[in-house]
């Protein structure tokens, strides 16, 4: 009997393979063919274009075990995860599909056969639902399968509109749609709940295990349902639900996969109560987080990366709640790989990257979590009602980086309501402020709407004849311009490359008899290319012919930098891992900037390896091959496509040997050897999960190396050596400096001890307490604490205030012996003095430090100390 989740997965795929279905691998959690989807959330996602007739496959029957995530957007189960028996951020959807092949009868028979014959589920435990008017499905269930009429439940339009029903599926307001039939399993009368369609249907007794969608109509914009020429079938069965049934448990969190993950999480954190809901949350979240990272998503502050970050942080918060004191989440990855079996193949290949990414995010959040929980606890302790206001929730999010859903989680556990409307209002107000600020210095040319087209000839030509088809000044269309006028010119054809894909627009000239227009930038305006610049000489009107001349030197240098970004991208993926994807770039004649996804600083050894890899490919002098092809063909060849970019059906593919292949519309060198030299000048983080490399090529790289050599020679001269001995001599100087600093510190301690002996005599007695207040000249701030400790030991029961002024700054220290902290607290004392010298400070009751910016007030401030102390000792 099939019982483990892995066995059920294999049995399902084998069943449909034996019935003529092509077994298709699970697609990525990042949809490659649907920009409207945040994550893959159903088995049919990867076949959407097939169902729409836009993609042809060499099979008409398919079966999959699809990885899915529902956390963010329309399908968001995050808030319920861990608190119910069946909500998950990650799940596997088993499915079988027919693309114009079999239809209702075969689909129903396949489902019933697998459940009752292969898995041997008792038929009396099963009931089915159909759409209210789907008599064909009723006949198949009743006559062909033998399900009693009372166990076939018709579901009508129960969502408030025609065809808005649990049993009618629609891709959108228009397009493919059709009725569906669902199979439910009865867990038994010991669990509350009623049959589907009954008032108690929300209970957990009857659980949907299989949904079969019959795509048989095309919904017209008028609402008319037109029959599809080739009806199709889309089915789905959640593996976690069927595993619970086969393993004799009611909750999905009791199946083998979750039992193993919960046990491991409990072991790592050190808890024994395996029924704790926080363990459920952690066990669920490691699945979605690990597989998302494996599919190329990195924690960030936007889009998919932000959802991933929220899930990781929710898991970490629940670990913290259980008592976790160090990073634990990433340690679950090996167990996850073990329990997921064949479904974890891609995860196993990226295990090291996944663990590093999760650990880095967890450690980064630990600091935010501790601070945020403290502030939230304080806010909740002061709450008089049962609602936490939106302003406080927003402040936690905006100032301290504490996600709203985590605030809601904590409040939920304490039966506190979160003012979500107030939070959203505060968010909207912030967006308005940001937009208002962002309007300053806006490029009003970007608002130009140009109804024209410009042909581009700049891949092969840098000079060409063209006709002026439009002229714009200050956003308005004009017919002519004169010398000195700034304008945007549109040509019918141009060799000028318009800014796109990170490559800056070309510069150059448009010339004719007595006419010279300097092009300072080139931008796209829809299908038109705008040449922005100034008319230096002559007059120019629409319809005139000009010679368009691109600045060859600038274009050449830009091409070097653009081509090398492709080599850099490929090298980063080789050295750091395939999770690296381009997040942005800037390519101009002077340098290149390349932003990419990565969870930590790139190590110097890794940077060196990347640089060496790129320069090796440059020396190999690969010919750059450019070809146009269908986007599907390009992807099959392994061409890198950028997430978020929209591509036409025909794309331009740039290949450099066997090292790099990318979709790209930019301009490039003829051979990699033209680049000459590649030199990285900096690497750093620009956002969480996003790194930036800046580099130079060609002559700029040679100049950079020459500058470094000159600086090295200058350093060698200062150290009185040659360039080969700089490191050794510098190390010797640093060692010498450390010894001098050590000697100086010892000398300062001796001086402080001597000074303390002299200062003891300056103490005055107030109500039996030694009080010493002193301004010290020539004493460094770092020596104050040691001096204060020495004085405390000598004076025994004492209150001490010392101050020093150096380079326009005041440093203060207050010390109170332990027997006196009940009457005088050092923190309050030093804060009083600091306030009078333009500063602030604080500390423990027995010792506190402060600073200030008004040394001219130090004497007067210290004069206030004795009366202040006397009052408190009275």
UniProtKB/Swiss-Prot annotation:
- Cofactors (names): Zn(2+)
In the record, biological process GO terms are: alanyl-tRNA aminoacylation; negative regulation of DNA-templated transcription
A GO molecular-function descriptor: zinc ion binding
State the Gene3D superfamilies in the record: 2.40.30.130, 3.10.310.40, 3.30.54.20, 6.10.250.550, Bira Bifunctional Protein, Domain 2 (3.30.930.10), Threonyl-trna Synthetase, Chain A, domain 2 (3.30.980.10)
Q: Which residues bind Zn(2+)?
A: 562, 566, 664, 668
Q: Does the keyword tRNA processing apply?
A: no
What note about domains is in the entry?
A: Consists of three domains; the N-terminal catalytic domain, the editing domain and the C-terminal C-Ala domain. The editing domain removes incorrectly charged amino acids, while the C-Ala domain, along with tRNA(Ala), serves as a bridge to cooperatively bring together the editing and aminoacylation centers thus stimulating deacylation of misacylated tRNAs.
Name under which the protein is recorded = Alanine--tRNA ligase
